[in-house]
């Protein structure tokens, strides 16, 4: 215990910049869902990795953007609130895109909070015409900051980043067991897995403004688990899309979700999906509490 070190790290950035992919890469498990949809991550996802005497606690956060509706505003508030519990803040930047006004706003707010982030220039495994300009801007405007060119997808330079992070850890007791990878409840993880499969299998047919709740989790005598989940949408037409012809689409989504759950949890799962229409669910705080935002 006396040799234990601990550090908490917050990962922030624009939507689809690679935050969730980075978290999954570092902990070695697909914990945070990743889809082509923007604003996939809605709440703070905690990932944990213990390397020798050092425990690293990572916070994957919702992407920061210009919010409009109630859900989007809650997500952005959630992202900024995560900074207060972190020892180190990493701002991940998509090197395939130029700096935009939102990125500059993020930098301005960090400066106003007296936070000096570590800059992660992500997606360097793909040639970018913007990378040199991004580096020049950071060197010219943030000369005291460190930046790491990385690829969260391929793992390039991730070991070097981890060496830096662990080197900043302070002597403190671990907060979690050595083999823990998250503190999220299994019910929440199961709901996230189903939400990911909804986005992957419906793609542009369905807006991201749906939510999934695990209503029942029953441990059975044969060591398997029965899970009942409800998919909540705002329109009856979305329910029709999710169900598919004669229920074919929801069966496909359920099958893929079940397989992902069994791989992640390590035990057999009996998954039952239901769809409910709740027109104004975004205006009800109970849903935000369940989503942890």
UniProtKB/Swiss-Prot annotation:
CDD domains linked to this entry: Era, KH-II_Era
Domain of life: Bacteria
GO terms under biological process: ribosomal small subunit assembly
Binding site for GTP: 13-20, 60-64, 122-125
A Pfam family assignment: MMR_HSR1
Gene3D superfamilies xref list: 3.30.300.20, P-loop containing nucleotide triphosphate hydrolases (3.40.50.300)
Main localization, broad class: cytoplasm
Stretch list, region G4: 122-125
G3: annotated segments: 60-63
Entry-linked InterPro entries: G_ERA_dom, GTP-bd, GTPase_Era-like, KH_dom-like_a/b, KH_dom_type_2, KH_sf_prok-type, P-loop_NTPase, Small_GTP-bd
Key words, A-Z: Cell inner membrane, Cell membrane, Cytoplasm, GTP-binding, Membrane, Nucleotide-binding, Ribosome biogenesis, RNA-binding, rRNA-binding
Family: Belongs to the TRAFAC class TrmE-Era-EngA-EngB-Septin-like GTPase superfamily. Era GTPase family.
Subunit structure: Monomer.
Name listed for the protein in its UniProt record: GTPase Era
Gene designation per UniProt: era
């Amino acid at each position: 215990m006396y040799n234990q070190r601990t550090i908490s790290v917050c990962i922030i950035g624009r939507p689809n910049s690679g935050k969730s992919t980075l978290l999954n890469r570092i902990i070695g498990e697909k914990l945070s869902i990743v889809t082509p949809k923007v604003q996939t991550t809605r709440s703070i996802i905690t990932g944990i990795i213990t390397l020798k005497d050092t425990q690293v606690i990572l916070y994957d956060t919702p992407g920061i953007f210009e919010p409009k509706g109630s859900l989007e505003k809650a997500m952005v508030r959630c992202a900024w609130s995560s900074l207060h519990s972190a020892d180190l803040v990493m701002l991940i930047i998509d090197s395939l895109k130029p700096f935009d006004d939102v990125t500059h706003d993020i930098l301005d707010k960090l400066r106003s909070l007296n936070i000096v982030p570590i800059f992660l220039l992500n997606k360097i495994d793909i040639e970018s015409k913007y990378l040199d300009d991004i580096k020049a801007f950071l060197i010219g405007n943030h000369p005291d900051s460190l930046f790491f060119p990385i690829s969260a997808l391929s793992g390039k330079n991730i070991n070097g980043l981890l060496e830096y992070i662990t080197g900043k850890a302070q002597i403190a007791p671990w907060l979690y067991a050595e083999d823990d990878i998250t503190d999220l409840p299994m019910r929440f993880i199961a709901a996230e897995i189903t939400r990911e499969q909804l986005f992957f299998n419906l793609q542009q047919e369905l807006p991201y403004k749906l939510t999934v709740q695990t209503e029942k989790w029953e441990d059975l005598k044969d060591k398997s688990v029965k899970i009942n989940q409800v998919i909540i949408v705002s329109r009856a037409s979305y329910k029709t899309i999710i169900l598919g012809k004669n229920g074919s689409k929801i069966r496909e989504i359920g099958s893929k979700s079940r397989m992902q759950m069994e791989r992640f949890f390590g035990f057999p799962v009996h998954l039952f999906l239901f769809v409910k229409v709740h027109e104004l669910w975004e205006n009800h705080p109970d849903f935000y509490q369940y989503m942890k935002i």
